[in-house]
């Protein structure tokens, strides 16, 4: 049975037709545009449809995800995966640490408790230059990375459901 649950690093389990939720924090609009572009490109390439929900900041992302997951389940059209996108830039106070740690913790809790494949694309940086390097699809493409993480976890979930 262990071999049946092992997958190659490049798992190609079909996820086309899946439905994803992207929740984005629009605190830094231009950076967010770049993160969203990367995530959308990855989901679209995999044949995954998506809905986008926009919230004011990173701390609101987990609550919006929980609300959307509940609504989708009640409607009979549950989401198969979730992508969280946002940007937190360090300032002069401990706000950075609070937002970074609490949003990440809440996302992990949601993913584990709800068994939902989730890619965390909330970038945490010291400078605007670091944010741009991480957000642009032509550079580090962290929006794309978050979508790929969600898709990888969805593939694992689907493969293990068949094992």
From Swiss-Prot:
It catalyses: (2S)-2-hydroxy-3-oxobutyl phosphate + 5-amino-6-(D-ribitylamino)uracil = 6,7-dimethyl-8-(1-D-ribityl)lumazine + phosphate + 2 H2O + H(+). GO terms for cellular component: cytosol; riboflavin synthase complex. GO terms for biological process: riboflavin biosynthetic process. Keywords: Riboflavin biosynthesis, Transferase. The active site is at residue 95. Pathway: Cofactor biosynthesis; riboflavin biosynthesis; riboflavin from 2-hydroxy-3-oxobutyl phosphate and 5-amino-6-(D-ribitylamino)uracil: step 1/2. Disulfide bonds: none annotated. One of its GO terms (molecular function) is 6,7-dimethyl-8-ribityllumazine synthase activity. (2S)-2-hydroxy-3-oxobutyl phosphate binds at residues 92-93, 134. It comes from the Bacteria. Pfam families: DMRL_synthase (PF00885). InterPro entries: LS, LS/RS, LS/RS_sf. Its EC number is 2.5.1.78. 5-amino-6-(D-ribitylamino)uracil binds at residues 27, 58-60, 87-89, 120. Catalyzes the formation of 6,7-dimethyl-8-ribityllumazine by condensation of 5-amino-6-(D-ribitylamino)uracil with 3,4-dihydroxy-2-butanone 4-phosphate. This is the penultimate step in the biosynthesis of riboflavin. HAMAP family: Lumazine_synth (MF_00178). Belongs to the DMRL synthase family. This is 6,7-dimethyl-8-ribityllumazine synthase. It comes from Nitrobacter hamburgensis (strain DSM 10229 / NCIMB 13809 / X14).
């Amino acid at each position: 049975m262990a071999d049946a649950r092992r997958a190659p690093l490049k798992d190609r389990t079909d996820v086309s037709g899946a439905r994803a939720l992207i929740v984005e924090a629009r605190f830094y609009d231009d950076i967010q545009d770049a993160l969203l572009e990367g995530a959308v490109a990855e989901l679209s390439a995999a044949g995954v449809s998506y809905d986008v929900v926009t919230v004011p900041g990173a701390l609101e992302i987990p609550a919006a995800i929980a609300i959307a997951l509940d609504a989708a389940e009640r409607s009979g059209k549950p989401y198969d995966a979730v992508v969280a996108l946002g940007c937190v830039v360090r300032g002069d106070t401990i706000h950075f640490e609070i937002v970074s740690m609490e949003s990440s913790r809440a996302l992990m809790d949601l993913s584990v408790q709800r068994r939902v494949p989730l890619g965390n694309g909330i970038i945490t940086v010291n400078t605007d230059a670091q944010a741009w390097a991480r957000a642009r699809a032509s550079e580090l493409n962290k929006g794309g990375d978050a979508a790929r993480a969600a898709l990888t976890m969805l593939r694992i979930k689907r493969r293990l459901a068949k094992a």
